Amino acid sequence: MPLKYGDRLDLAPTMGRWMANAGRELLADADAIVPVPLHWRRQWMRRFNQSALLAEIIAKASGRVVTHGALKRVKATPQQVGLGKSERAENVQGAFRVPAEGKAEVTGRKLVLIDDVLTSGATAEGCARALLRGGASSVDVLVFARVVAGGRAPI
């Protein structure tokens, strides 16, 4: 994906606005937006978190707040590219947690989790489970694209 792997940050505003439009019903009911976090090492190497960029644009378009501290990636995982569904699930198992300082941003709140691409759903499920364990009342997921089985077409 050009945004994530091609440093095409110029694509983020358009992508974020499309996501805000497509997810307007989810966002209308949400208390806050949570981007899928990167492990600090991956963010340092990439220099940005594409999900956080999209979340900021979506928040601006929808009038919602982004809670960057609500969810942390506590385990450095290998990239998911090329992994099957069960390998992806195993890869992110235990990778996400609501930190003590993020509890207030989560407890009792309706959250919308933001990511760029949904492939197997393993990352979204891992994040949603962590947020629900952390006290969120509900978690919806909003992504820019979904990979369909058998397809490797560029997005």
Give residue spans per PLM region:
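Conserved PRPP/pyrophosphate-binding segment of the phosphoribosyltransferase/PRPP-pathway fold
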Residues: 1-113, 120-155
